[in-house]
Every structure is written in structure tokens, then in C-alpha cells.
Design a protein with these regions (language model features):
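Bacterial N-terminal signal peptides
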Residues: 7-24
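Cleaved targeting-peptide boundary
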Residues: 19-39
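Beta-strand-enriched cores of mature, soluble protein domains
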Residues: 37-255
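Positively charged n-region of N-terminal signal peptides that target proteins for export
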Residues: 1-4
Length: 255
């Protein structure tokens, strides 16, 4: 998947508002939104996997690879993904984001040349406060400037662990979603990780490289569009973005 969220806009406002929405989030409904902040920043690491073969061609094309029907899956073109995020450090005005965890599950669809993706469910760890959720949503609108056909939010308990040779994350103990990656044993030219450098990650201006780690499993078990894949694309990446990296919005035209 070309990140989770290739152009992730067409409309930053739509994505930001959706990610900060309260669908299925009773606790967020009564929360006051943090004031708009001119200064914000996020440095986050993602455990990411999708249904595409290794390495996901969505980073170089306007559509995902074709999939023959197998293991109970229908054929066609799609990129079904799970992205598990952990914020290393960040803020949105006075709202601190260090340590916040959240998850994205969905499908980019078969053609995203216009910046329109199929569907996504964003799940926040229960420890993330309403103010943090709203702040994350606004920042992620710049990270992934796209429009979604369907956008929902949820809440769950998230585990996130990155080691030397493996990385894994679970939602609700794996009942809702799970991802497990492993470092390839035969692809490296020598000791160390296999890393793709100088490749842009969505709307972010800086990243540490795509650390390639095929998945052992990437699955989403909730809702009406569950999926599960094994042995397909996976990687870890750390991105960095600040408010200074995003150009100011164009002024509204006088009517």
C-alpha cells in the first residue's frame, strides 16, 4: 500500500475532519476540540502491511497489483492494508502526542490516480485522549492528503512491538486486527536490514527509509469487509513532518 493512507489530496480538510470525527466514539462526542494550532509536529513509526506482493507497487503506480482469486479471496485490483502507528514525539499546539498509538485498516481500491481511495477504519488506542485524537486527525490530513469513499473511527486496545528481526502489532489481542512482520533472511547483501532510501512516503518530507519486512500475517477481522493475507508486503518506516513543511492554504476567492 502506498503508505496507508498517492496522493493521500484531494482534500486535506475532509480527511482531517473524518479522522477527528466521533463515529462510534461516544467518549469523543462531549470532548472539546483543541484550538487550531499554528505550530505542530509529528515523528512516528509505522508497522505497515498490505495485500500487494513485496514490494508494494502502489508507491510507483496509480493502482495496485492484480490479484488472482486464491485462499478464499476474490480476484481484482486492490490494496488492503493494516498500518499500526506509534508516535515517537509530537505535538499540536499545547497538545502532546508522545507515545500515542493508533491503527488504520482499509483498502486503497483499484485506481487512486485521482486521489480517491476506497475505505478506511481508524482505531485509536483507548489511552489516546479526545484532544489527542483530534490533533492526530488534523496532522494526518497532511500526511495522507486523499479522499475516502468510506471513513469510520473506532476505539480499541492496541499492542505495538518492534524488535531486531520481527515487528508485530495487535488490536484487541488480535480479535480486531493483527500484523506480524519478519526480516527477510536471504534478501540482504550482508548483515543488517534491507532498506529502500530516497523514496517518498505520501505527504511527508522526511523518512528514515523503508525497512523491508514481509508479513507473516496481516488481517482485519471486524466489520463487513474482513480480510487476511500471509506472506505479502510489509515494512517499517519512521516519518517526520511539521507545520513548516505544509504550504499555507490558498486564500478564498472573492465572490
Amino acid at each position: 500500500m502506498r503508505g496507508i493512507f498517492v496522493s493521500l489530496v484531494a482534500t486535506l480538510g475532509l480527511v482531517a475532519a473524518a479522522m477527528a470525527g466521533t463515529t462510534g466514539m461516544a467518549g469523543m462526542a462531549a470532548a472539546a476540540k483543541p484550538a487550531d494550532a499554528g505550530d505542530w509536529a509529528m515523528n512516528a513509526t509505522i508497522i505497515e502491511a498490505c495485500s500487494c506482493p513485496m514490494f508494494c507497487q502502489c508507491y510507483f503506480n496509480a493502482g495496485p497489483s492484480g490479484h488472482e482469486g486464491h485462499e478464499g479471496h476474490a480476484g481484482g485490483h486492490f490494496c488492503k492494508f493494516n498500518n499500526a502507528y506509534r508516535v515517537n514525539h509530537g505535538h499540536y499546539g499545547a497538545v502532546k502526542l508522545d507515545g500515542a498509538k493508533f491503527w488504520g485498516s482499509g483498502d486503497l481500491g483499484g485506481d487512486f490516480s485521482t486521489g480517491k481511495m476506497d475505505w478506511i477504519v481508524v482505531t485509536f488506542d483507548k489511552s489516546v485522549t479526545p484532544e489527542q485524537r483530534d490533533a492526530i486527525g488534523k496532522i494526518m490530513g497532511a500526511v495522507y492528503p486523499v479522499e475516502w469513499g468510506s471513513f469510520k473511527t473506532a476505539e480499541g486496545t492496541m499492542e505495538w512491538t518492534a524488535g531486531k528481526d520481527t515487528a508485530w502489532a495487535k488490536l484487541d489481542g488480535g480479535k480486531t486486527a493483527e500484523v506480524k512482520l519478519h526480516r527477510p533472511e536471504t534478501a540482504a547483501n550482508g548483515a543488517g536490514d534491507v532498506v529502500i532510501k530516497n523514496l517518498k512516503y505520501w505527504g511527508t518530507p522526511r523518512n528514515t527509509g523503508f525497512v523491508l519486512m514481509p508479513n507473516e500475517i496481516e488481517a482485519y477481522h471486524a466489520g463487513d469487509k474482513p480480510f487476511e493475507y500471509k506472506g505479502t508486503n510489509g515494512f517499517m518506516i519512521t516519518f517526520d513532518i511539521t507545520s513548516k513543511d505544509v504550504p499555507p492554504a490558498a486564500p478564498a476567492k472573492a465572490s
